[in-house]
A protein has these predicted regions:
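Bacterial Sec-dependent signal peptides at the C-terminal "C-region" and cleavage site
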Residues: 21-29
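Acidic/charged, solvent-exposed loop-and-adjacent secondary-structure segments enriched in E/D, K/R, S/T
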Residues: 104-131
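Bacterial N-terminal signal peptides
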Residues: 11-21
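Short, low-complexity, Pro/Ser/Thr/Gly-rich segments in the mature regions of secreted, periplasmic
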Residues: 240-254
């Protein structure tokens, strides 16, 4: 047997063995559907989520490397209405939201902006009330792709692919099944960026276990720490809270 023939057979044999090993490793991973449903279970259960129809969150944020601090207030109502206001010391106010149809942002630095394309698709996902519970309505495919270590914990990596827009990767702690990392490709007027988020400090608000600290790692800007200080479920939110600002109406009317 000449060396090239032997080498070729060894390579083929190695490829076969590796393919079998990879297939068996994939079989050992729990299905993404199981992980996503278990997350709902460990954070309170389907019935607890279904009791909530609106929500107000208040908290703070801090850009560690830049020393910038601010406050955050978020209003959300089913099925997909939202309004968020961030006030940064020395930099003014940033707002974004949707009335369920038009998705927009407005800031003292960037002015008014109506989201379209991939940016709009991303906003549709983030504004959906109880998105974690209703993931089957939002994603055309979910798949467990492997294991990743996050802050010393082994986690299952789940890739969720929406009908439109980029895939989202979420990592769930093997032991607790709590989500400990999310990676998205964020679209904005400034371009496309990969953003890693690390939810921690899970505590109960009412019947739900929720993260009260979320660290985001932003390219070129370092870490941003969001701290949730209060969560109110089923508040009466005036309908005009989700109305389009005049500046956004003007942009819409130009189209």
């Amino acid at each position: 047997m000449n060396r090239s023939y032997a080498a070729r057979n060894i390579a083929i044999g190695t490829a076969v063995v590796l393919s079998i090993m990879l297939a068996r490793a994939a079989d050992d991973l729990p299905k993404a559907e199981t992980i996503l449903d278990k997350y709902i279970e460990v954070t309170g259960g389907k019935a607890a989520y279904q009791k909530h129809h609106s929500e107000i969150q208040k908290g703070t944020l801090e850009f560690g490397a830049m020393g910038i601090k601010g406050t955050l207030t978020s209003y959300r109502a089913e099925p997909n209405k939202s309004y968020q206001e961030v006030e940064l010391t020395g930099l003014g106010k940033t707002q974004e939201g949707t009335d369920g149809k038009v998705f927009w942002s407005l800031s003292s630095m960037m002015g008014p902006h109506v989201k379209e394309g991939a940016e709009k698709a991303q906003a549709v996902l983030s504004s959906t009330f109880n998105a974690d519970l209703n993931w089957r309505d939002l994603f055309k495919d979910v798949k467990t792709t492997g294991v990743e270590t996050v802050d010393g914990k082994d986690c299952y990596k789940v890739v969720l692919t929406p009908a439109e827009g980029g895939a989202i990767t979420q990592c769930y702690d093997k032991q607790s099944n709590l989500m400990v990392k999310m990676t998205i490709t964020a679209e904005s007027p400034l371009g496309t960026q990969t953003v890693d988020s690390f939810p921690t400090d899970y505590r109960k608000d009412g019947d739900l276990l929720m993260p009260h600290k979320i660290k985001q790692v932003l390219p070129g800007m370092g870490d941003v720490m969001f701290t949730i200080e209060s969560v109110t479920f089923n508040p009466e939110i005036p309908a005009d809270r989700f109305a389009l600002p005049d500046e956004i109406k003007a942009l819409v009317n130009k189209k």
